[in-house]
Swiss-Prot record:
GO terms for biological process: methylation. This is Ribosomal protein L11 methyltransferase. SUPFAM superfamilies: S-adenosyl-L-methionine-dependent methyltransferases. The gene is prmA. Belongs to the methyltransferase superfamily. PrmA family. It is an enzyme of class 2 (transferase). It comes from Agrobacterium fabrum (strain C58 / ATCC 33970).
Length: 292
């Protein structure tokens, strides 16, 4: 049964906004959505939804209805997805990414790792987060800064994806880490990446939608919570997230466009967190907040 991709071509900022909109709209439906950079110099991006071919007519109409009010004039295009090994394909030409002392790399670039590096080997393929996106790189930089400056006894990586951020915490500090994701495939991939990086203890991985799991009560409250998701769900979950944060605890938030920064800050200031620092990477921001 063939798979297709419906996509629109736009700018990086609009692609992020479209991704945010589609994530909120499609929720837990059995479709995948993504943004892809096509041409960095000309700021050309694609926002895509992946589905089975027989769903095309229904989803074309739904996507058109969803996007038309805010993004008039966008043309929905189609690509038939060939039957290839996407994990291998995703790693072709993938260059190592440096963020502070961290270097995120594939197996083909192990020789690029230097003795002082905190190396994270990721074969993401099926899950978001190889370090190449500004949100992931910003989180890695912030994690290093926070763990250098503060005493952290345990951590939560909410929406772990490939597991790269949870692995980063364990690479810097031998503390217990809980990593969760709504997607069981992401959790499976994260477990493989954890094993690949030689982490044999101190890491719990769970499939959990939001905070609806006993794992949060079992492992929390947390001195550090990392959530690299999207602005809308981050805003909605602010009151819940703060209840799982230990007194004096730290939060790192990303997946946020620069234009959404104040809305997210407002939600977390309202939940009694203080803003400490913002890292800017292109049009994306990573926020550091603290519970007083």
């Amino acid at each position: 049964m063939s798979e297709i991709r419906l996509y629109v071509t736009t700018t990086e900022i609009k692609a992020g906004e479209i991704l945010d909109l589609m994530s909120d709209y499609f929720g837990e439906e059995d479709v995948a959505i993504a943004t892809t950079e096509v041409d960095e110099k000309r700021d050309i991006w694609e926002a895509s939804v992946y589905l089975m071919a027989e769903q095309e007519e229904e989803f074309r109409e739904r996507v058109s209805t969803l996007l038309a009010p805010a993004f008039p004039g966008l043309v929905i295009e189609k690509e038939i997805i060939p039957d290839v090994d996407w994990i291998a394909k995703s790693l072709e030409g993938l260059k190592p990414v440096r963020a502070g002392r961290f270097i995120v790399h594939g197996a083909h670039d192990r020789d690029k790792v230097q003795p002082h590096d905190l190396a994270i080997e990721i074969e993401a393929g099926q899950a978001f987060g190889t370090g190449h996106h500004g949100t992931t790189a910003g989180c890695l930089e912030m994690i290093e800064d926070v763990l250098r400056a503060r005493k952290v006894r345990n951590a939560l990586d909410l929406g772990t994806g490939s597991g790269v951020l949870a692995i980063a915490v364990r690479k810097m500090r031998p503390i217990p880490v809980l990593a969760t994701d709504i997607d069981p495939i992401a959790v499976k991939v994260a477990k493989e990446n954890v094993r690949l990086n030689g982490i044999v203890s101190g890491m719990a991985l769970e499939t959990a939608p939001g905070f609806h799991s006993d794992a949060f009560r079992k492992h929390g409250p947390f001195d550090l919570i990392i959530a690299n998701i999207l602005a809308r769900p981050l805003i909605k979950m602010a009151p819940q997230l703060v209840t799982h944060l230990a007194p004096g605890g730290t939060v790192i938030l990303s997946g946020i466009l620069a234009s959404q920064r104040w809305k997210v800050l407002s939600a977390y200031n309202g939940a009694k967190l203080s803003h400490i620092r913002t890292i800017w990477r292109n049009d994306w921001v990573t926020l550091h907040l603290r519970k007083d």
